[in-house]
Amino acid sequence: MVRTQTESSTPPGIPGGSRQGPAMDGTAAEPRPGAGSLQHAQPPPQPRKKRPEDFKFGKILGEGSFSTVVLARELATSREYAIKILEKRHIIKENKVPYVTRERDVMSRLDHPFFVKLYFTFQDDEKLYFGLSYAKNGELLKYIRKIGSFDETCTRFYTAEIVSALEYLHGKGIIHRDLKPENILLNEDMYIQITDFGTAKVLSPESKQARANSFVGTAQYVSPELLTEKSACKSSDLWALGCIIYQLVAGLPPFRAGNEYLIFQKIIKLEYDFPEKFFPKARDLVEKLLVLDATKRLGCEEMEGYGPLKAHPFFESVTWENLHQQTPPKLTAYLPAMSEDDEDCYGNVSWPGWRARQVALGPPCTGLHARAPDPRVICSRKGRVSVPLRQACWWL
């Protein structure tokens, strides 16, 4: 996300800065002298505001629904940034001003090695710019698709990094609400950097608010409480963590169907299968995270927080104190990669060779009345209609 705002052209509702974040007109705002400062003390000089011409823009790193992320080199320092660029006119037209403001404000609160860092913001008459740390190795999802599934050592290491990041984030009173492999980037040294905070929620300490009441997220990782109660909590991120651990081992998320409606039905009924060769300790961890009752998930406040989660047998060999200084393991495939032709646009695929264990708990869905699309018509990522999909045999 990016924001910009000039004195002459400022989109309504986009502040120039905030107390907790960098001002939109350049680097972080300088603190004002306090009441006890000398009468004639001069404020420190403000750094020159950054402008687009200060950078050489290169390849496109990613494109969202209303933003583009471009690799840029600062001419004065030769330092590389991922600069998120967004047109003011578009965000106003699409009512995305709160999204942009939220991302800026949340990222300005974070100072942790496992999160993308916001270095500066600036703007011109037409565009907003966020200067972000450059995660050179791209999305975690890319490696899941390339490798197929991670071996136990890799699964443990990257799961531990995500747990460490969530512990920090939740300690700040922030819910991510859209945690998924696409939003977990890998930097040059192969450490994770979590990104995309446009749908994040900062909980209010005054009201002791523990939930965020709006429907956001991605179908395969949405928690059941968001579907039944229309609200998310810190424990909703732990549900997403369980889905990600499953995907690291199996290569696909646990809840898959021909369309979002059917995916939601499976989530609410807790219907998913474990492959026969799923690591036993990882399986136990996933089962303790994919729990319908948000207050019973391992790691949530009602279950004594992150201590019991980090003490789970799956993490027995993990040294938590210096994860960001440990050498990441070489990515090693547990099972071969799946062809894109085997997966539809919802991650749905037929897996022969499974000894399916169906987990079916909870009442049927009562809160969703939308008519489901015809499940026989499934669009693949390459735009074809496939009925049925070609079966994948990579788990045999």
From Swiss-Prot:
Binding annotation for ATP: 65-67, 84, 133-135, 139, 182, 196
Which molecular function GO terms apply here?
ATP binding; protein serine kinase activity; protein serine/threonine kinase activity
Q: Which species is this UniProt entry from?
A: Homo sapiens
About its domains, the entry says:
The PIF-pocket is a small lobe in the catalytic domain required by the enzyme for the binding to the hydrophobic motif of its substrates. It is an allosteric regulatory site that can accommodate small compounds acting as allosteric inhibitors.
Q: What biological-process terms (Gene Ontology) are attached?
A: intracellular signal transduction
Q: Where in the cell is it found?
A: Cytoplasm; Membrane
Spell out the family assignment given in the record's similarity comment.
Belongs to the protein kinase superfamily. AGC Ser/Thr protein kinase family. PDPK1 subfamily.
- Function description: Phosphorylates and activates not only PKB/AKT, but also PKA, PKC-zeta, RPS6KA1 and RPS6KB1. May play a general role in signaling processes and in development.
UniProt keyword annotations, A-Z: ATP-binding, Cytoplasm, Kinase, Membrane, Nucleotide-binding, Phosphoprotein, Serine/threonine-protein kinase, Transferase
- Composition bias, Polar residues: 1-11
Which SMART domains does the annotation name? S_TKc (SM00220)
Stretches assigned to coiled coil: none
Which protein, by its recorded name, is this? Answer: Putative 3-phosphoinositide-dependent protein kinase 2
According to Swiss-Prot or TrEMBL, what is its membrane topology?
A: Peripheral membrane protein
**Enzyme Commission number(s) of this protein:** 2.7.11.1
Ranges for the region named PIF-pocket are: 86-130
**Region span, Disordered:** 1-53
Please give the CDD domains that the UniProt record associates with this protein: STKc_PDK1 (cd05581)
Q: Which GO terms describe its cellular component?
A: cytoplasm; membrane
The residues responsible for catalysis, as annotated, are: 178 (proton acceptor)
The record lists the catalysed reaction(s) as: L-seryl-[protein] + ATP = O-phospho-L-seryl-[protein] + ADP + H(+); L-threonyl-[protein] + ATP = O-phospho-L-threonyl-[protein] + ADP + H(+)
Q: Which Pfam families match?
A: Pkinase (PF00069)
Keyword presence, Oxidoreductase: no
Instruction: Fill in the PTM field for this protein.
Output: Phosphorylated on tyrosine and serine/threonine.
Q: Taxonomic lineage per UniProt?
A: Eukaryota, Metazoa, Chordata, Craniata, Vertebrata
